[in-house]
């Protein structure tokens, strides 16, 4: 299950998470984001209980995008213990995302 992040739940869901967190920064008008969306959903199912999968709509949550230095979308950031440890900018294959996650768990 993917969690929609906003300024109210970001700290608890990402920064204070006991497990690694994958955060997908996206926008509805972004073509590559639409291509990545089913991959992110698949990752949420595949890693359920091991990795928390979250999404941030940059149009609705500009402050979170700025806080994470998002300049291009889609951008996926992996967090461990509240710290960003890996950033993947642009559309990637599921293998790329799985490799990045597997390095952390």
What are these regions (language model features)?
Residues 3-21:
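A short beta-strand-turn-helix
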Residues 6, 26, 52-54:
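Conserved Rossmann-like nucleotide-binding pocket used by diverse enzymes
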Residues 18-19, 25-29, 72:
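Short pre-active-site segment immediately N-terminal to redox-active cysteine/selenocysteine motifs
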Residues 18-20, 37-56:
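Conserved helix-turn-beta segment immediately C-terminal to the redox Cys motif
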Residues 25-39:
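Conserved redox-active cysteine motifs that mediate thiol-disulfide chemistry
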Residues 58-66:
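Structural microenvironment flanking redox-active thiols in thiol-disulfide oxidoreductases
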Residues 78-105:
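Non-catalytic, surface beta->alpha helical segment in thiol-disulfide oxidoreductase systems
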